[in-house]
Amino acid sequence: MEQNEFGLIEKIVDLNRVAKVVKGGRRFSFSALVVVGDGNGSVGFGMGKAQEVPEALRKATERAKKGMVQVPLVDGTLPYEVLGAFGAGRVLLKPASKGTGIIAGGAVRAIMEAVGIHDVLAKAIGTNNPHNVLRATMAGLTSLRSAEYVSQLRGKKLEAPRK
């Protein structure tokens, strides 16, 4: 986990050498998948391709910064359980009690760390392709709505939860 000069957390999810087959053989380039977050509810992801690794990472990071979205957090976890989907990938995200930690793998873990979630249970279903898992996770996170937002939509007063 590395922080840049703006206090953003940058995580490399996937770095691949890809080949384009041309008449004279194969032409290689690099593909990078990066997640950027502020550790306080904002997160974005980007993909970059270039002839050199640093350039691919730079492009991916720029795209990630441009596409950042806000995620509602409640005490370092999610407000409620959510299922995100993209392609064959499904990602189940469950809120967890304090001290649980981030129980997630690969791309899901990178997003959770970047967005600032400390306690969560996650399961990727259907695929382990980092691109689809990442997009499914982002779909789940962007579908989350805060209690304040929902109460405003419904024109109701927000009450304390019943125990």
From Swiss-Prot:
GO biological process, one term: translation
Keyword Ribonucleoprotein recorded: yes
GO molecular function, one term: structural constituent of ribosome
GO cellular component terms listed in the entry, alphabetical order: small ribosomal subunit
Protein keywords: Ribonucleoprotein, Ribosomal protein, RNA-binding, rRNA-binding
Annotated S5 DRBM domain residues: 8-71
Keyword RNA-binding: yes
Cross-referenced SUPFAM superfamilies: dsRNA-binding domain-like, Ribosomal protein S5 domain 2-like
Entry domain remark: The N-terminal domain interacts with the head of the 30S subunit; the C-terminal domain interacts with the body and contacts protein S4. The interaction surface between S4 and S5 is involved in control of translational fidelity.
Protein family: Belongs to the universal ribosomal protein uS5 family.
Function description: With S4 and S12 plays an important role in translational accuracy. Located at the back of the 30S subunit body where it stabilizes the conformation of the head with respect to the body.
Quaternary structure, from the entry: Part of the 30S ribosomal subunit. Contacts proteins S4 and S8.
Name of the protein this chain belongs to: Small ribosomal subunit protein uS5
Native species: Oleidesulfovibrio alaskensis (strain ATCC BAA-1058 / DSM 17464 / G20)
